[in-house]
Curated annotation (Swiss-Prot):
SUPFAM superfamilies: alpha/beta knot (SSF75217), L30e-like (SSF55315). This is 23S rRNA (guanosine-2'-O-)-methyltransferase RlmB. GO terms for molecular function: RNA binding; rRNA (guanosine-2'-O-)-methyltransferase activity. S-adenosyl-L-methionine binds at residues 198, 218, 227. Belongs to the class IV-like SAM-binding methyltransferase superfamily. RNA methyltransferase TrmH family. RlmB subfamily. Specifically methylates the ribose of guanosine 2251 in 23S rRNA.
Length: 248
């Protein structure tokens, strides 16, 4: 059991049952928990012969950090994608890729929110550097509401080199920066695209910025100078979605 991970929350556990049921070894519900929104989860567990047990809520509180909603699953360790897997994914992609890069985002809540947004926008994958970045944790999975089990999260050793390879494949690299001259709404986002979001406060690293084909900014009309990275990610990705739908 020590090799198993614990994930929690209704959406995260249900998404894992839908997409990777063989990874789920045991599901625990808090004692007396019974409500309509658990019906799908329990049906999936029964279909995949995953045992479901009950535990005291205080015991479950000790298992995980965060609001578990009375649902905890023991699962085999998750797999973070590597660069070769990304290349294979791009080979199979029939529509213009839309890749999100998070450069130095270390907060797990922000990573989870960005994964959720990227999945909702139909992004091909999310790329993060292996160092100085948040990675998949139970908190990330909970915040992502199931998206962490669907969208590929690719951890790369050398982000600059990865960007070069993507450019060689014909993808355009667009970075977000507050000092950029062009607003995102003026940039063509309909082609094969890499969208880079930097860490809050610091922004993109110098080497990452140097590999951008274009820099864009979000117009800020109020007194604040920037948005939370997950909010900015949503604005940028869905502008790309909007442009692509208009072009059809």
């Amino acid at each position: 059991m020590s090799q198993l991970e614990k994930i929690y929350g209704v959406h995260a556990v249900q998404a894992l049952l839908q997409h990777h049921p063989k990874r789920v070894k045991q599901i625990w519900l808090s004692e007396g928990r019974s409500e309509p929104r658990l019906e799908t989860l329990l049906a999936l567990a029964a279909e995949n012969r995953v045992p479901v047990g009950q535990a005291e809520r205080r015991e479950m509180d000790a298992w995980v950090e965060g609001v578990h909603q009375g649902v905890v699953a023991e699962v085999s360790p998750s797999q973070v994608w590597g660069e070769l897997m990304l290349e294979e994914l791009l080979e199979r992609t029939e529509t213009p890729p839309l890749i999100l890069v998070l450069d130095g985002v270390t907060d797990p809540h922000n990573l989870g929110a960005c994964l959720r947004t990227a999945d909702a926008a139909g992004a091909t994958a999310v790329i993060v550097p292996k160092d100085k970045s948040a990675t998949l944790t139970p908190v990330v999975r909970k915040v992502a509401c199931g998206a962490a089990e669907v969208i590929p999260l690719v951890a790369v050793t050398n982000l600059a080199r990865t960007l070069e390879k993507l450019q060689q494949r014909g993808l355009w690299v667009v970075g977000t920066a507050g000092e950029a001259e062009q607003e995102i709404y003026q940039q063509d986002l309909t082609g094969p695209l890499v969208m880079i979001m930097g860490a809050e406060g610091k922004g993109m690293r110098r080497l990452t910025r140097e590999h951008c084909d274009f820099l864009v900014k979000l117009p800020m009309a109020g007194s604040v100078s920037s948005l939370n990275v997950s909010v900015a990610t949503g604005v940028c990705l869905f502008e790309a979605v909007r442009q692509r739908q208009v072009k059809r």
